[in-house]
């Protein structure tokens, strides 16, 4: 049996990773300075570095929280190299490449999971295939932080 993921743990991990994600999204032109500012510490130190373990924890917990809150097997969410889950009710996928896949970078996922950005804002920067992938937008953010 898989243990239930705590929303507190997800918020804590996202809060730790938010400055890093905000700085990366700002650098990529996907986030305005005004939106990024509350997430990036004044000295900028936290925005420039984050341990791989902390990044992995934030990504894994938040993606798994999505799967917990939107159970199912019709859409696969991938955030390489850290995690891939199936979620959203619907036809079950069992072999080969799933028909509905969304794949994105860790910083984009963390921005979506924490409410910094919306799926519509970054749609051109993520790989989406299938008719049901946009349904993950109905379950975002996973945990709003500010």
Annotate the PLM regions.
Residues 33-57:
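Negatively charged, low-complexity tracts enriched in Asp/Glu with abundant Ser/Thr
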Residues 66, 83, 132-134:
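Residues that cap or initiate secondary-structure elements
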Residues 45, 63-64, 146:
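Charge-dense, helix-prone N-terminal extensions
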Residues 1-35, 97-146:
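C-terminal interaction segments
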Residues 70-72, 80, 121:
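A generic structural signal for short, non-catalytic loop/turn and secondary-structure boundary residues
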Residues 53-75:
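A glycine-rich beta-turn/hairpin centered on an aromatic-Pro dipeptide
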Residues 51, 78-80:
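Short, glycine-/small-residue-enriched flexible loop/hinge segments at domain edges that mediate gating
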Residues 79, 86-101:
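Mature extracellular/passenger domains of Gram-negative fimbrial/pilin and adhesin proteins
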């Amino acid at each position: 049996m898989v243990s239930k993921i705590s929303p507190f743990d997800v918020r804590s991990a996202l809060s730790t990773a938010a400055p890093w994600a905000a700085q990366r999204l700002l650098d990529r032109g996907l986030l305005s300075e005004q939106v990024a500012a509350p997430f990036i510490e004044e000295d900028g130190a936290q925005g420039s570095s984050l341990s791989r373990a902390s990044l992995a924890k934030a990504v894994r917990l938040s993606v798994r929280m999505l799967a917990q809150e939107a159970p199912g097997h019709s859409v696969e969410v991938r955030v390489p190299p850290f995690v891939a889950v199936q979620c959203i009710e619907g036809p079950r996928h069992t072999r080969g490449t799933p028909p509905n896949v969304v794949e994105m970078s860790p910083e984009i996922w963390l921005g979506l999971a924490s409410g910094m950005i919306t799926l519509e804002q970054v749609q051109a920067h993520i790989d989406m295939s299938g008719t049901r992938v946009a349904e993950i937008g109905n379950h975002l953010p996973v945990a709003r932080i500010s």
